[in-house]
């Protein structure tokens, strides 16, 4: 296979003959003046310009920067260069210069001025040292000004800037997030090699004329390949993008021009970005090795990226766009008082002929360590001061970049739960229906027939066969027993089996057998002798009944002990009590010992004294019951984890045996493991969160008790004095049952059995703490008072008999003599949870107001409108727009209301509260009612439409000397879709679905805008104008509902276990004062005290509450389930990057096929005005266009257009320059991990 591809090798690992072929091929290529020569191909990048077409009057550079197709264009470009080089005699692909590792110098291959041919001994100039730019002059060559940044050698334990930032790029799981991080890091090499030299790598116009460009971009492309391999390891798509879909079918120029400009038929034919993903198949090259800093793909993910994600991190975010020049940006972190510390830096590559570009998401650079050194928290008050210097040394105005934002990414364990599809939910084996049983049996039959490494024999051999420490020198079995990582090894092992079952057609996750429940026989799945296979129309042996052991040419057997059904059997039974004692433990390693030994009991009770059975460490995994047993075992660990979380104790980490948790487990980590999923999950410390492994359990109840009830049951057992037999266990090279007797004098009673699972090839193990068996009931049965245990010379003692699995009685001294431990009763005081103090004012649905409520509100509003003080209507309404009361540093006045920014919800929460408190001061006993416009309505609320004696009908605008008016549009009432298909419902449901506050805010705000536009219509003094909207009393009912929607989202976040009273994005903006609420002129002490975004999340502290937080009749848990159901379908979104346009407008768009057939795509509104505060979102507003595409019979990846029309509220059509072209991205159905 290797002969079919050109191999790109590390430039430092080229052989003499390979270097020789590259040098001479490139010399020939530089002399070639045709379209296949070096300078012709170098011109593809920028100058002389060829785009948009060679004959266009105004041309620009063809290279794509600052957009999602940057990697695609440059992948094709390196192929263009590589194949030309190959045609000129090169025997290998374009070598790559790996700058991700610490370097001391630029490789000689590209730095030396001369090259001495090792075969002819003739010295010639090194063509890779520089390039000629003949279109300027014959004497013009590229220059280099190498920066010391390139030769960074970090202190021990730290990595270089380049490595850290590439690792951050590789961490991303969304292609467009990866792309922006990759591109900006790549820019640094351009900057650090070219410096201030004009004809250099640091100038977009001339970069491609320096031969180092191609070695640099070979490495950039290799990093993309590494990311693709990581995506495959993660189980995510590596060969297509789900974002920027509109760009993926646009041919890349000038490659698509063909002859005479491009003489390469392959790059002409395969010139669409979508062709670039499968580089080996389409372009026939590969890399010698895919590593970073000597870390393999698996190690990058498991040992580095996951480790980084386990930490709380803070980033500065920059929304970048082109400004016609290369530049270097540095920034400082500054606190009040002027003290500043160096933050970090990044580069932009540009030139005057560059194609216009703007990213639609933030470039992130980590500042965690800087803040830590400054003793600052992520939400401390600090500013980021950015300095931008152009390539020629000119300092550019800081305003060329939007203000940097601060983002916090909490440790990954705090991420949202992964939505697990039904076929990844492990259920009780007794709850399976006939179809489930048939499916599992058919899948296991196929797994058993599979003789590959995905088949049963290989999987079963992982447990007990002699494979470790390496297949080359096998000494013992790989399974981990008798050590703290026993649960982790078996968690990933069961996952490995389950993945194979799914690969062979199983649509049912591995069920669990709850052996603590009463029973008289094994479950049907495990015990039926045969089953009917509907596919083959045959009656076949039940594959779960036994397993074949190829190496022994025999089948597994079972010797089920009657005690299995005697010691199980519900509350009071031995297994129940043993599991309860296990779950009682609060230290992970204490839990693990109890857990493992209880699990051993089932191996013994099913396998008995048989060799090829569950009771043998070597052969237990060949009996399929093993996997159903271990599904229950893993579930018990999950229950303990839930208990620990309930106790506010560590549940996703251990503070013991730390040395074992960081080492990848064998054989899963080996390259011979064909399952990339389990290979990536082979490190114990990453296995605590089973949701991230792609499965969960139907429930975590134990004998009908939820976690809270289970904890109470544990407390009941702890409320009594107890005595335990304590065993210090270690490996004895065999499976054995240890029979315990409690004796007084010569009288003895059976006290229980401890089973040890082992074998002659077991990995050596000793527990470092004891296994405890409760013998309190035996003492009571023998009428031995607990006090007698303390009597000197007492004859109370323990005796053991040890019987190996083959029936031999072992010397009782094979294990240390157990001791007795007395544990006194614990007392528990039940904590009484205090409910959050409810606000004194309740906001009701406007349609549920009583006549007395309505009268009270109208009377109070009339009094507020008559009040000319700072707490009167005119003053409060002016907070939003005109008269202008906020000022820039230069004195220019602007409207204080915050729109198009993260604090929009917070600012309007305070304004609504300000008006509400004014109403309360004038006699209202109810809060501002909310108008729920997400439900179907045919008219505006009666509260605001009755004309007679109604202060809510309109209000006077003193500053304009006129009254407010409304001009509702037809679409406000005439939505043809109802219920969960209606316009407002769909917009708000999409907002509520978001789990990041900034994602929610954008969807939420733009959804709210439509009410402003459609109620106010063309009225200049109404809801549709930012300047005067707050003078219409309806504004406050609208914003009461808007605030309630935010409150619903907050309740959803709380239910999801995610931040709800804080945000992890744009943190620096959330700590800034919200004017004018913070000013001394504000008479409201409550809004003044909460006049930042950060302090206004908790609305209970503002003294109000809602009558309920239901959404369309759904409670918060029901709403969350409904939102998840919505996500179970593929959806396609148009993304609009919105910013200030200085007026209110409606945006309508159609989706059109390339043949011109169009259908309505959607509509949304922008609320603005001449005096609005400047704003720009840092991420796209998403609009679902799935239905529109279905109407046109289009798929997300098809070629289509989105035609946008922007209309001002006065009906005039506005220029499309106000909006960037929309992007398209796919949100795949959440049905697979």
Swiss-Prot record:
Segments of this protein annotated with the region ODD: 1-4
Pfam families in the cross-refs: Haemocyan_bet_s, Tyrosinase
Cross-link 2'-(S-cysteinyl)-histidine (Cys-His): residue positions: 63-65, 479-481, 897-899
Record-level Gene Ontology MF annotations: metal ion binding; oxidoreductase activity; oxygen carrier activity
Entry's cofactor comment: Binds 2 copper ions per heterodimer.
Keyword match Membrane: no
Span list, region ODE: 5-422
Listed cofactors: Cu(2+)
SUPFAM superfamilies per UniProt: C-terminal domain of mollusc hemocyanin, Di-copper centre-containing domain
Keyword Glycoprotein in annotation: yes
Binding site for Cu cation B: 186, 190, 217, 599, 603, 630, 1008, 1012, 1039
Family annotation (InterPro entries): Di-copper_centre_dom_sf (IPR008922), Haemocyanin_beta-sandwich (IPR028999), Haemocyanin_C_sf (IPR036848), Tyrosinase/Hemocyanin (IPR050316), Tyrosinase_Cu-bd (IPR002227)
Glycosylated residues (UniProt): 392, 538, 890
Keywords: Copper, Disulfide bond, Glycoprotein, Metal-binding, Oxygen transport, Repeat, Thioether bond, Transport
Disulfide cross-links: 51-62, 176-243, 334-340, 468-478, 589-656, 743-748, 886-896, 998-1065, 1152-1158
Location of the region described as ODF in the Swiss-Prot/TrEMBL record: 423-839
Residues binding Cu cation A: 45, 65, 74, 463, 481, 490, 880, 899, 908
Source organism, top-level taxon: Eukaryota
Region ODG, residue ranges: 840-1233
Family indicated by similarity: Belongs to the tyrosinase family. Hemocyanin subfamily.
Chain's role: Hemocyanins are copper-containing oxygen carriers occurring freely dissolved in the hemolymph of many mollusks and arthropods.
Description of how the protein assembles with itself and partners: Decamers of large identical subunits (350 kDa), each containing 7 globular oxygen-binding domains: ODA, ODB, ODC, ODD, ODE, ODF, and ODG.
Name of the featured protein: Hemocyanin A-type, units Ode to Odg
Protein species of origin: Enteroctopus dofleini
């Amino acid at each position: 296979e290797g002969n079919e591809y050109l191999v790109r090798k590390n430039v430092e690992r080229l052989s003499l003959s390979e270097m020789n072929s590259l040098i001479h091929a490139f010399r020939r290529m530089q002399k070639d003046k045709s379209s296949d020569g070096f300078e012709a191909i170098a011109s593809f990048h920028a100058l002389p310009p060829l785009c948009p077409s060679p004959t266009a009057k105004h041309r620009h550079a063809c290279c794509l920067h600052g957009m999602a197709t940057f990697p695609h264009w440059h992948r094709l470009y390196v192929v263009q260069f590589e194949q030309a080089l190959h045609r000129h005699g090169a025997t290998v692909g374009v070598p790559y210069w790996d700058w991700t590792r610490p370097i001391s110098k630029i490789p000689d291959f590209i730095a030396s001025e001369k090259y001495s041919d090792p075969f002819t001994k003739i010295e010639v100039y090194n063509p890779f040292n520089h390039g000629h730019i003949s279109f300027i002059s014959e004497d013009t060559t590229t220059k280099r000004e190498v920066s010391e940044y390139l030769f960074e050698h970090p202190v021990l334990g730290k990595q270089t800037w380049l490595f850290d930032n590439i690792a951050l790029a590789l961490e991303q799981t969304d292609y467009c997030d990866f792309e922006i991080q990759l591109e900006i890091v790549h820019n640094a090499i351009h900057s650090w090699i070219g410096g201030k030299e004009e004809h250099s790598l640091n100038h977009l116009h001339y970069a491609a004329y320096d031969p180092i460009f191609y070695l640099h971009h070979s490495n950039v492309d290799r990093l993309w390949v590494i990311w693709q391999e990581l995506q495959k390891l993660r189980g995510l798509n590596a060969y297509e993008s789900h974002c920027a879909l509109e760009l993926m079918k646009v041919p890349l120029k000038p490659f698509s021009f063909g002859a005479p400009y491009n003489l390469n038929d392959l790059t002409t034919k395969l010139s669409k970005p979508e062709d670039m993903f499968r580089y080996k198949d389409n372009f026939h090259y590969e890399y010698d090795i895919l590593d970073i800093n000597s870390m393999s793909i698996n190690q990058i993910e498991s040992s580095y990226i996951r480790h980084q994600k386990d930490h709380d991190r803070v980033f500065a975010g920059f929304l970048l766009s082109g400004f016609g020049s290369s530049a270097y940006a540095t920034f400082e972190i500054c606190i009040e008082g002027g003290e500043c510390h160096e933050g970090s830096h990044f580069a932009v590559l540009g030139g005057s002929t560059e194609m216009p570009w703007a990213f639609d998401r933030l470039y992130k650079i980590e500042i965690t360590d800087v803040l830590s050194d400054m003793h600052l928290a992520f939400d401390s008050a600090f500013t980021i001061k950015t300095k931008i210097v152009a390539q020629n040394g000119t300092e550019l105005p800081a305003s060329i970049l939007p203000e940097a934002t601060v983002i916090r990414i909490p440790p990954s364990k705090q991420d949202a739960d992964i939505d697990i599809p039904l076929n990844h939910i492990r259920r009780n084996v007794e709850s399976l229906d006939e179809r489930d049983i048939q499916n599992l049996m058919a899948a296991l039959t196929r797994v058993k027939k599979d003789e590959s490494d995905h088949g049963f024999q290989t999987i079963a051999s992982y447990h007990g066969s002699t494979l470790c420490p390496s297949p080359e020198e096998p000494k013992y079995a790989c399974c981990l027993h008798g050590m703290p990582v026993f649960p982790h090894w078996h968690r990933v092992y069961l996952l490995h089996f389950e993945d194979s079952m799914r690969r062979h057609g199983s649509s049912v996750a591995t069920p669990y057998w709850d052996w603590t429940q009463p029973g008289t026989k094994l479950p049907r799945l495990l015990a039926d002798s045969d089953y009917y296979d509907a596919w083959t129309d045959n009656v076949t042996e039940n594959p779960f009944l036994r397993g074949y052991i190829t190496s022994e040419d025999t089948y597994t057997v079972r010797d089920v002990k009657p005690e299995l059904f005697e010691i199980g059997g519900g509350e009071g039974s031995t297994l129940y009590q043993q599991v309860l004692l296990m779950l009682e433990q609060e230290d992970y390693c204490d839990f693990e010992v109890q857990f493992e030994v209880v699990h051993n009991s089932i191996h013994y009770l099913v396998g008995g004294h048989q060799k090829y059975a569950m009771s043998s460490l070597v052969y237990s995994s060949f009996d399929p019951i093993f996997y159903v047993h271990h599904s229950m075992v893993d579930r018990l660990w999950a229950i303990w984890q839930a208990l620990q979380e309930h106790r506010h104790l560590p549940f996703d980490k251990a503070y013991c045996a730390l040395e074992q948790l960081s080492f990848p487990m064998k054989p899963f980590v080996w390259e011979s493991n064909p399952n990339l999923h389990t290979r990536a999950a082979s490190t114990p410390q990453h296995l605590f969160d089973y949701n991230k492994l792609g499965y969960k359990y139907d429930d975590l109840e134990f004998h009908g008790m939820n976690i809270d009830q289970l904890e109470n049951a544990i407390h009941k057992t702890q409320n009594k004095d107890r005595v335990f037999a304590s065993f210090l266990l270690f490996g004895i090279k065999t499976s054995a049952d240890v029979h315990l007797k409690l004796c007084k004098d010569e009288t003895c009673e059976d006290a229980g059995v401890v089973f040890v699972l082992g074998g002659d090839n077991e990995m050596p193990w000793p527990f470092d703490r004891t296994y405890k068996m409760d013998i309190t009931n035996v003492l009571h049965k023998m009428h031995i008072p607990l006090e007698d245990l303390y009597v000197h010379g007492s004859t109370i003692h323990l005796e053991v008999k040890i019987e190996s699995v083959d029936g031999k009685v072992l010397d009782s001294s094979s294990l240390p003599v157990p001791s007795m431990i007395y544990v006194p009763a614990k007392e528990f005081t039940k904590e009484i949870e205090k409910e959050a103090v409810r606000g004194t004012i309740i906001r009701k649905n406007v349609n549920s107001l009583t006549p007395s409520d309505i009268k009270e509100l109208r009377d109070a509003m009339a009094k507020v409108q008559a009040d000319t003080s700072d707490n009167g209507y005119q003053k409060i309404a002016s907070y939003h727009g005109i008269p202008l009361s906020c000022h820039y540093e230069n004195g220019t006045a602007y409207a204080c209301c915050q729109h198009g920014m993260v604090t929009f919800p917070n600012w309007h929460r305070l304004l609504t509260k300000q008006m509400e408190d004014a109403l309360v001061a004038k006699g209202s006993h109810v809060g501002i009612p909310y108008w729920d416009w997400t439900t179907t309505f045919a008219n505006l609320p009666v509260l605001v439409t009755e004309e007679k004696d109604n202060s809510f009908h309109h209000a006077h605008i003193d500053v304009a000397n006129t009254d407010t008016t409304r001009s509702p549009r037809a679409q406000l009432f005439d939505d043809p879709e109802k219920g969960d298909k209606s316009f407002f419902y769909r917009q708000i449901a999409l907002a509520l679905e978001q789990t990041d506050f900034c994602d929610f805010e954008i969807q939420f705000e733009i959804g709210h805008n439509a009410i402003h536009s459609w109620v106010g219509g063309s009225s200049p003094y109404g809801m549709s104008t930012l300047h005067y909207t707050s003078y219409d009393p309806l504004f406050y009912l609208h914003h009461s509902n808007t605030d309630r929607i935010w409150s619903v989202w907050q309740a959803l976040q709380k239910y999801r276990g995610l931040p709800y009273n804080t945000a992890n994005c744009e943190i620096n903006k959330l700590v800034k004062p919200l004017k004018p609420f913070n000013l001394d002129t504000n008479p409201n002490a409550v809004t003044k005290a909460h006049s930042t975004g950060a302090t206004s999340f908790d609305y209970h502290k503002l003294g109000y509450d809602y009558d309920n937080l239901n959404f369309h009749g759904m409670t918060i848990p029901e709403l969350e389930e409904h939102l998840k159901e919505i996500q179970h379908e593929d959806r396609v979104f148009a993304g609009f990057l919105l910013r200030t346009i200085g007026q209110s407008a409606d945006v309508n768009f159609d989706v059109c096929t390339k043949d011109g057939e169009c259908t309505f795509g959607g509509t949304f509104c922008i609320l603005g005005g001449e005096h609005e505060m400047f704003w720009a979102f840092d991420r796209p507003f998403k609009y679902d266009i799935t239905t529109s595409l279905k109407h046109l019979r289009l798929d997300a990846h098809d070629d289509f257009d989105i035609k946008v029309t922007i209309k001002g509220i006065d009906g005039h059509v506005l220029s499309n320059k106000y909006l960037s072209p929309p992007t398209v991205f796919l949100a795949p159905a959440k049905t697979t991990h």
